[in-house]
A protein has these predicted regions:
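A short acidic, Gly/Pro-enriched loop at the edge of an enzyme's catalytic core
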Residues: 245-256
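Conserved class I S-adenosyl-L-methionine
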Residues: 146-187, 200, 204, 227, 287-310, 315, ...
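A short glycine-rich, Lys/Arg-flanked "PGG" loop and its adjoining helix->strand segment in the class I
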Residues: 270-282
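ATP-dependent NMP and nucleoside kinases share a basic, alpha-helical "lid"
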Residues: 79-117
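Class I SAM-dependent methyltransferase SAM/SAH-binding core
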Residues: 192, 198-246
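NTP-dependent small-molecule kinase module
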Residues: 6-7, 13-35, 54-57, 61, ...
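A short SAM/SAH-binding and catalytic strip from SAM-dependent methyltransferases
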Residues: 256-268
Length: 344
């Protein structure tokens, strides 16, 4: 069935690497589903929801979980038997009942919620723009702590983009430099770039703290750090492979945290902010940055802004206040996003 997925949605043959990605991806979804009886629906454009549901059913059965795939496109009051996963697909099924888990596929030109329902209330959101390389992109709060999905799915997403990451964003290094200069990081201090990617901020961070300061760059994806080294950015910082949810630093050890695009990729915003607060000294800085404003970034991805997004002004004000930070700067311009908070 996995080979059929590639055959039905892509002219490219399924390689051993992409087959492994599919198996890992399906195992991760299976680990996110509730134990015991569960009603699950897969939705999205075209025929892909049915194919993904078939593949997931095979994975569940292989793991010893009873799974029922209801037939037809005219739902009735069907309910799963005790201990069984009911696995349906398509918009008709999605609107037929309440579901324990809604899985939404981003694919083609309709990946960001142009269909009724979309991903707004989905528990699991999948990027399937490349049928040979599926990736879990978002897991809603009730499901986020389940399974082992976060590390492998994050690496799967970013590893294939590392080589072209700098090209994708163009010449935006001056925007990094301007944001870091505005933050006024203490010279001689310790600054940690969490989620550093290819290290685009590292030259400006080194300039901010000077030769007597310490710059540490952390990322979860080995390929991102490798490209940071290729571009010579390891000369500005120590590069460390680590998970931003469990940073390997002592409490109150940093004077400033820089994070470009990190918060929107974390499964639990407040837990992530709390971890950043743990390693920051009282009075230290949190600098949240993106070289595009929120509206411009949303338009690029074909979606509209929602008031409950992690970086929305009111939402960020609440989450920083709840995790030991005081938000002092919030600038969501078209050309950049910059928020600065002080550790309480």
């Amino acid at each position: 069935m996995i080979a059929g997925m590639a055959h039905n949605t892509s002219p490219l043959p399924m390689t051993a690497t992409s087959s492994h990605r599919w198996h890992e991806f399906l195992d991760n979804i299976a680990s996110l589903l509730p134990a015991g009886t569960a009603a699950v629906v897969v939705d999205g454009p075209g025929e892909q929801p049915g194919i993904v549901a078939d593949c997931l059913a095979e994975t569940l059965r292989a793991a010893g979980r009873p799974c029922w795939r209801p037939a037809g496109t005219s739902p009735d009051a069907a309910a799963p038997a005790a201990g069984t996963v009911m696995l349906a697909d398509g918009p008709a099924w999605r609107t037929a009942r309440d579901w324990d888990v809604v899985i939404w596929l981003r694919a083609g030109h309709a990946g960001h919620g142009h269909h009724p329902g979309g991903e707004a209330d989905a528990g699991i959101v999948i990027d399937l723009h490349d049928p040979a390389w599926p990736v879990i992109r978002r897991v809603a709060g009730p499901f986020a702590s389940r399974g082992r999905w976060y590390i492998s799915e994050t690496r799967a997403f970013f590893s294939t983009r590392a080589a072209t990451w700098d090209t994708k964003f163009g010449d935006d290094l001056p925007a990094y430099s301007a944001a870091i200069a505005q933050a006024r990081i203490r010279p001689g201090g310790v600054v940690i770039d969490v989620g550093c990617g290819t290290g685009r901020a590292l030259p400006a961070l080194r300039q901010a703290v000077g030769s007597d300061g310490t710059v540490i760059a952390v990322d979860l994806t080995p390929e991102m750090l490798r490209h940071a080294r290729v571009k010579g950015r390891a000369a500005h910082a120590a590069l460390i492979l680590a998970d931003a949810r469990h940073l390997p630093f002592a409490s109150a050890s940093a004077d400033a945290i820089f994070a470009a695009g990190l918060i929107t990729h974390m499964p639990d915003t407040q837990a992530g902010l709390r971890q950043l607060a743990r390693i920051t000294r009282p009075g230290g800085l949190l600098i949240l940055f993106h070289p595009s404003g929120r509206a411009a970034l949303a338009a690029r991805h074909g979606r509209t802004l929602e008031p409950d997004e992690p970086l929305a002004a009111a939402q960020l004000q609440r989450s920083t206040a709840a995790t030991g930070w005081h938000l002092t700067t919030y600038d969501d311009a078209e050309c950049r996003f910059l928020a600065i908070a002080t550790r309480q």
